[in-house]
Amino acid sequence: MNPKKNNNTFLSYFVCLFLLLEVGLGQNQISEIKVGVVLDLNTTFSKICLTSINLALSDFYKDHPNYRTRLALHVRDSMKDTVQASAAALDLIQNEQVSAIIGPIDSMQAKFMIKLANKTQVPTISFSATSPLLTSIKSDYFVRGTIDDSYQVKAIAAIFESFGWRSVVAIYVDNELGEGIMPYLFDALQDVQVDRSVIPSEANDDQILKELYKLMTRQTRVFVVHMASRLASRIFEKATEIGMMEEGYVWLMTNGMTHMMRHIHHGRSLNTIDGVLGVRSHVPKSKGLEDFRLRWKRNFKKENPWLRDDLSIFGLWAYDSTTALAMAVEKTNISSFPYNNASGSSNNMTDLGTLHVSRYGPSLLEALSEIRFNGLAGRFNLIDRQLESPKFEIINFVGNEERIVGFWTPSNGLVNVNSNKTTSFTGERFGPLIWPGKSTIVPKGWEIPTNGKKIKVGVPVKKGFFNFVEVITDPITNITTPKGYAIDIFEAALKKLPYSVIPQYYRFESPDDDYDDLVYKVDNGTLDAVVGDVTITAYRSLYADFTLPYTESGVSMMVPVRDNENKNTWVFLKPWGLDLWVTTACFFVLIGFVVWLFEHRVNTDFRGPPHHQIGTSFWFSFSTMVFAHREKVVSNLARFVVVVWCFVVLVLTQSYTANLTSFLTVQRFQPAAINVKDLIKNGDYVGYQHGAFVKDFLIKEGFNVSKLKPFGSSEECHALLSNGSISAAFDEVAYLRAILSQYCSKYAIVEPTFKTAGFGFAFPRNSPLTGDVSKAILNVTQGDEMQHIENKWFMKQNDCPDPKTALSSNRLSLRSFWGLFLIAGIASFLALLIFVFLFLYENRHTLCDDSEDSIWRKLTSLFRNFDEKDIKSHTFKSSAVHHVSSPMTQYIPSPSTLQIAPRPHSPSQDRAFELRRVSFTPNEERLTTQTIHFEDEESDIECVVEQ
């Protein structure tokens, strides 16, 4: 064998083996990726989370040993300082060139780090910064691996809706953590009055007590607390000391506090939060979670042997966030040199002018956004770079227990703890709900302020109308004592309440008598109520809630009255309007014609010369007005029409008489003006009460501002009206009635009345006193006490006639009676149709004759038939008998009577005559008839012989 050849072969094998080893080593090479961690290392909270982060990496790479990347943690201490946290992040980016940052702990530290991450394109994932304010900072490189605080506000709103609480005080800390949730909470609780109570983040015990004592003086007893858990724990301790954890109070904690409250107490009793409700995100139970808790506890004890604490939800979020970051890094395949070189160089780690930009930041962010897995805290699914909204648990702290009393989900809302059906806490639930003070009764959410606190009631100072409200202030004691109609009703209503309310009155003076500023004081908390002649308006209701009105509502017009005794010459025409007069006259003519039509052939009263028939018809029709007609109606159709018409006439005459009486008596004193449009058209001056909303109302109605004159009292109004300065005074009905109680014979209230809401008492929005006082006002106004109060302040008014007694032009019009005329018209029309049908049927041979006569001749013949007597009518047959004298009379008739009568016209114009002979005997009346016909070309004579 050739030694040289063997050496070459050996060398070739060696080279191949070397290359294979290089390839294998290259394939198994592990890349170390630097990741920064910014925590407050001296806090237990950060130690808990750091243990979870280390365990997350250990578990992840233990489960995936073949992954080519490994996260190398570079931990920095933020020292509970925002500036230090930003400096730590800058150091990690500039000097360590980390690919991502985990942290910081709170939202305040995250605010600057987000901007830094956006500038350097380094993804920053936080598992504990929950403030919604961070979402408003425009940055694509901030990832929230925790729950946004705004997610829970709908669950809180559902609790309020379930219990019906109408007001709440939001107690929050004055930083990004507390302020971030407030806009969302206010929006969710739109139907609830939300007040604020801000606690400084570094508040001492005295500051906390001062704020709590201030809250005790309010009516609201429902509090929502949102702040760091340690500060909240101190607030609950002080609230317990001063008695704010007793029966009647409601305390509700937000998500982060509910999760952390047990950790803050470090195993101590939870008595300071006994009966408190809490909202927290739901963590599904799993075998993996229980296993992790055991391993976490062992590791935490090794790393921190002097601490005793439990795993919190934030530790779980830290674990899941770290796991998600490791998965995204592996998916991105980041190299060891992740940064592009910045222009310039500097050795200063805080030099902002030479910031490096991560090459793999966009890819890592995209990979992180696509990560989906079931984590220890629940489903890890990022939507817009933050965790999706989870299910929330409703927790009730009872002793040392945390009872789950319900759930809330985005899709189903509140869900009973024992079922999947939507429900409320007032229905079936898992165990009783315990409230502060060990009470099982749902608090109503408000109480009258304790410790003898009085409600501050504002009372307006008026220049007139003192019977409504008058304020008297003692110059020595400076004690304000109001009196008047409004004050008496208010105090009577307070006595009807099931609890004691002590009003403390404060006078309010306004140069322009405008009550809007007084209502504003209720809105800003200066006053607890406003009592007086305050009109309820839509604008004022934006700033306060009003009770039910305690006076008659409406704006009306008051004018002087004048005696019209000498101006009533034509007063008899006033009860009816022109349309009613014309319609009635037309119907009189119509009814007269219809009755004549029905009676002409069968009733001798309606026969004779034309002028006699016309006179009889009109006489009969108009005489029905006084039921004085003496003509007998024999036709059934005419009787039907007359009966209907008599009913119409009866109603018309009675209405006319009643209205005429009103015009001759009540309306003898007529108002000087009765129409608003006439006042505007004539340019008359009108008055209004100074400072009242009526001025704006009059301008809206069309009055010129220059034509408006104010008055401040009933005396001023009387002076303006009496001397002619104004033609009318506009004000609310209650004021006008007060004026009439003094001058009832001189003025009158004229319709129409424009609707308003009336006078009411103002309370803060959503105040529970509003509804209770409204109910009390109803009790007062419906009882005898109201009459006593009215007599006390408006005694003379009872002696005046009703000021609204039809002083407007109340003529009766056709609109009031068109139904009657419709009935009469239909009755006449139907009767006329029946008559025409019967007449045409009887004379059908005239119309249907086959002769060559023209239509006109046939109609003429038909008219002649109508004009003749209907011999077949029973009226004429009976008249022939009754015209003969009775046998008991002394009159002896002639032996016989011969009557020749023409028969109805035949189509051939033949004539027939009836010959009658009537004979009598002393003892009986006997009538015989014999018909004899004489026929020729000219006539056909019928001879009737009566024997």
Curated annotation (Swiss-Prot):
Gene3D superfamilies: 1.10.287.70, 3.40.50.2300, Periplasmic binding protein-like II
Molecular function in Gene Ontology: calcium channel activity; glutamate receptor activity; ligand-gated monoatomic ion channel activity
Single GO BP term: cellular response to amino acid stimulus
Extracellular compartment segments: 27-577, 654-819
Cytoplasmic side: 599-607, 629-632, 841-947
Membrane topology category: Multi-pass membrane protein
UniProtKB keywords: Glycoprotein, Ion channel, Ion transport, Ligand-gated ion channel, Membrane, Receptor, Signal, Transmembrane, Transmembrane helix, Transport
Principal location: membrane
UniProt signal peptide: 1-26
Distribution of this protein across tissues and organs: Expressed predominantly in leaves.
InterPro entries (UniProt xref): ANF_lig-bd_rcpt, GABAb_receptor_plant_PBP1, Ionotropic_Glu_rcpt, Iontro_rcpt_C, Iontropic_Glu_rcpt_pln, Peripla_BP_I, Solute-binding_3/MltF_N
CDD domains: GluR_Plant, PBP1_GABAb_receptor_plant
SUPFAM superfamilies: Periplasmic binding protein-like I, Periplasmic binding protein-like II, Voltage-gated potassium channels
SMART domains reported in the protein's UniProt record: PBPe (SM00079)
Location of this chain's protein in the cell: Membrane
Annotated TM spans: 578-598, 608-628, 633-653, 820-840
Glycosylation: residue positions: 42, 118, 333, 341, 348, 420, 478, 524, 659, 704, 723, 779
GO cellular component terms, A-Z: plasma membrane
Pfam families reported in the protein's UniProt record: ANF_receptor, Lig_chan, SBP_bac_3
Protein function: Glutamate-gated receptor that probably acts as a non-selective cation channel. May be involved in light-signal transduction and calcium homeostasis via the regulation of calcium influx into cells.
Oligomer and partners: May form heteromers.
Family: Belongs to the glutamate-gated ion channel (TC 1.A.10.1) family.
The protein, known as: Glutamate receptor 2.8
Organism of this sequence: Arabidopsis thaliana
